[in-house]
């Protein structure tokens, strides 16, 4: 994203063609796993083939990247040309994000589970609602809806429901946000504080949102 942020959006625009090239691979990954849309890979070769890893295939924090990057290009050149060029993949990216989220009937909310968070120290089988991923989901789904409106399409009401009911970030009795909702020992277990600063990224990299307490 540095290209657009440092005044060279044309360089970023040139790189986004890779996503079109590997779309069939990403679509097949999503289909094989029972999801809609396209699931973007974390570690790949130039053709989109996933690199061997017991972590990479469980990561989801890279999924919203395309929406974020396309939005940077649009901000630099807010035109119908950009919308026509990238809206298809923006929507396909969001389709996966919606289908990946699980509705928690008991609490009346959407949750993110079955993923390894960005700091890569938590287990996919037990992790619920990692904070950076929640914030990124909230941001990117909102942007995807804006792209629908820019393209003259109606907002997806199911997506709006997910945005409205996405789980807030979990915190402990000291009002400190957790590495995941289930990671109650975040500030006692070095596994949770020895890698990527995912909690800070939730509102440091991403804008403030309603999942985070204003106080």
Language-model features: locations:
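Short charge-dense sequence patches
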Residues: 22, 41-47, 88-93, 206
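Phosphate-binding glycine-rich loops and adjacent basic patches that engage nucleotide phosphates
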Residues: 28-34, 48-61, 96-108, 127, ...
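Acidic/histidine-rich catalytic neighborhood
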Residues: 92-147
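Primarily short, surface-exposed interaction patches in extracytoplasmic proteins
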Residues: 1, 22-26, 75-81, 86-95, ...
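Glycine- and aromatic-rich loop/turn segments at beta-sheet edges
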Residues: 27-41, 99-116, 173-184
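Active-site core of glycosidic bond-cleaving carbohydrate-active enzymes
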Residues: 1-28, 32, 55, 59-76, ...
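Acidic/His metal-coordination segments adjacent to aromatic residues that form catalytic metal sites
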Residues: 40-58, 113-130
């Amino acid at each position: 994203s540095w290209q657009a942020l440092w005044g060279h959006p044309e360089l970023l625009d040139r790189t986004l063609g890779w996503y079109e090239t590997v779309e069939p691979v990403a679509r097949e990954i999503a289909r094989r796993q029972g999801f809609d849309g396209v699931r973007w890979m974390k570690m790949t070769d130039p053709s989109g083939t996933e690199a061997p890893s017991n972590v990479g295939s469980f990561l989801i924090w890279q999924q919203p990247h395309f929406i974020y990057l396309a939005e940077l290009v649009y901000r630099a050149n807010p035109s119908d040309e950009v919308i026509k060029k990238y809206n298809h993949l923006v929507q396909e990216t969001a389709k996966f994000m919606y289908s990946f989220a699980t509705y928690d009937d008991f609490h009346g909310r959407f949750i993110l589970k079955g993923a390894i968070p960005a700091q890569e120290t938590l287990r996919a089988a037990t992790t619920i609602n990692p904070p950076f991923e929640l914030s990124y989901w909230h941001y990117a789904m909102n942007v995807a809806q804006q792209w629908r409106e820019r393209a003259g399409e109606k907002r997806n009401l199911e997506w709006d429901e997910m945005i409205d009911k996405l789980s807030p970030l979990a915190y402990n009795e000291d009002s400190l946000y957790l590495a995941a909702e289930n990671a109650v020992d975040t500030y006692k277990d070095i596994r949770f504080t020895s890698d990527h600063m995912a909690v800070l990224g939730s509102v440091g990299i991403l804008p403030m949102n309603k999942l985070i307490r204003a106080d």
